[in-house]
Amino acid sequence: MFFKVDEEIPRWSAVTWAILPKWSTKCGQQSFIIPDHQLGYMHNEKSEGNNSKILVIGLGQIGYSNAEYMTSMGLDVDGYDVSESAVMRALDAGVIRNRARNFEGYDYYIICISTHNPEDMSMPLQDGIFQLAEKISREGKPGALVGIDSTISRGTSYRVLDILNHRLHVCHVPHRFYINEKQDHGVRQTRVVGACDSCCMAEAKRFYGEILDIPLFEVSSIEVAELCKIVENSYRFLEIAFAEELKMMCDNSGVNFKELRDAINTKWNVKILDARDGIGGHCLPKDSQMFLNNTKTHVGLSIIEAAKEIDLKYRMHIRRKVEQDTHMQVQSQQRV
């Protein structure tokens, strides 16, 4: 029996993959010459519907919320995290059924780990993604779907696919979860989906679109999906940095920032943000750095660089202002 290179094949058991001579082409599209006496091993192991086994990898804010959403739909969800407390929190809350000790036997592997450097949250670090890919490659079920919800830089998904030796499907569906507005911006909201190949896209749409009932915006390449999240957050970074620059200008020149901002925002196509405590958190600093790394390679100059300098200057500005206000308060109390 012979399957052509461009023909999608069934997702056979691990024992079948072990005995078949094969050479890798595109994900889920490989050529096999199968002797008749081995045909008995062939069967599709993909579970259907609510019987599918899901492993959420990373049980922080995003992974926990994903697992919670999936479990609320009656799906079979296990969890994996290097943090003991994260696993126990999810188990105690009933968000996951079991702690995964290994990655065997799952139909869907949903990666939700942080991609920032733990020593510097403003810098990306994707080593964890590739280490997980190595583990999935060793233990994962051939033909399963690896969904990357974590924010990643351009080219990461194809590298993951290579580590998996093209034996599993890979897609990227960057999360848009916002903890402060879970009702409107939770797990189920319009999400971008990109995939390494057409077979990967079919699996992605089946899982995220049909099983999880998430509205999807399909893009033609996985690189577009990878860029979407980092561009979204870089754009947000620029908006905040502009507000910070304006606030410093107002403070230093005696203009009321709030009044100016309110006046400007009466125009229908302008929305200047508030300037608060500087741009922090897990996402914006790190994601904008991913974008900066990309633009410096392909453009050279980047306004993100200037925005980062503005944010740093603004942090110093508000620190000085707090110190000045505190000093004036102390002097005022001393006079009294």
Regions found by a protein language model. Name each.
Residues 23, 28, 32-99, 104, ...:
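NAD(P)+-binding Rossmann beta1-loop-alpha1 motif at the extreme N-terminus of oxidoreductases
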Residues 117-179:
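Rossmann-like NAD(P)(H) cofactor-binding subdomain of soluble oxidoreductases
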Residues 110:
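N-terminal Rossmann-like NAD(P) cofactor-binding module of classical short-chain dehydrogenase/reductase
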Residues 2, 12, 23, 32-52, ...:
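NAD(P)-dependent Rossmann-like dehydrogenase/reductase catalytic/cofactor-binding core
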Residues 113-114:
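Conserved NAD(P)H cofactor-binding loop of Rossmann-fold oxidoreductase domains
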Residues 35, 40-46, 139, 162-173, ...:
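Internal alpha-helical scaffold of NAD(P)-dependent oxidoreductase catalytic cores
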